[in-house]
Regions:
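Repeated scaffold domains used in trafficking and secretory/extracellular systems
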Residues: 72-81, 110-122, 152-166
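Beta-strand C-termini and the immediately following turn/loop, strongest in propeller blades
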Residues: 88-91, 126-132, 170-174
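Residue-level detector of high-confidence beta-strand sites
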Residues: 68-70, 107, 150
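Hydrophobic single-pass membrane-targeting/anchoring helices
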Residues: 3-44
């Protein structure tokens, strides 16, 4: 029985090794080029270590209300309170804030400004622009900020994104899309 488990190649010349090294180098360069230019490289995802817990339901109406904190959210059309966090969208960043303190529990940012932020079920929907309009959509789990489903499509440069909690509507001047909870287009 042979003691060497490797089978010797029939031939292995210096030129063969140089060609293999050159091919490997070209592949590494191509992969590096695409990674360098990708939006994934410019994405900063800081999920929460533990899922947020939803606040207990109020048993009675309080006699007075008091403001505890404020946050800027230029990319939401209505307040988004979901999965135990208050979701804000401003500039390039979507964040999940603790509803009691306003402290950031998680954040997700890309290299370009947000178009809009909405929600469906327990999924935060962040919409970013690319060369085809506001059609780069990232889903984030509301309680942790972990990435979920995503989609990419043609869209207008300016869109209004709204939700009834069951589906998300992205409406522009010339295009309209309706997404379900896994961000599959229904319309």
């Amino acid at each position: 029985p042979p003691t060497d488990p490797m089978i010797r190649p029939e031939r292995r010349t210096r030129a063969d090794l140089i060609a293999a090294a050159a091919i490997a180098a070209v592949v590494v360069l191509i992969v590096g080029f695409f990674w360098w230019r990708s939006s994934a490289r410019a994405t900063i995802s800081r999920p929460a270590a533990e899922p947020a817990t939803a606040a207990a339901k109020a048993e009675s109406v309080p006699s007075a209300l008091q403001q505890r904190w404020t946050a800027t959210s230029t990319r939401t059309t209505t307040p988004v309170v979901l999965g135990g966090v208050v979701v804000t969208g401003d500039g390039r960043t979507v964040a999940g804030l603790d509803p009691q303190t306003g402290e950031q529990r998680w954040s997700y940012a890309r290299d370009t400004d947000l178009c809009a932020v909405s929600y469906v079920y327990n999924l935060v929907v962040a919409v970013y622009p690319d060369t085809r309009g506001c059609g780069q959509v990232s889903g984030l789990q509301a309680s942790t900020g972990q990435r979920g489903p995503s989609r990419s499509s043609y869209a207008d440069r300016v869109v209004v994104v709204t939700s009834d909690g069951n589906a998300v509507l992205s409406a522009g001047a010339t295009r309209l899309e309706l997404w379900r909870s896994d961000l599959i287009r229904m319309l």
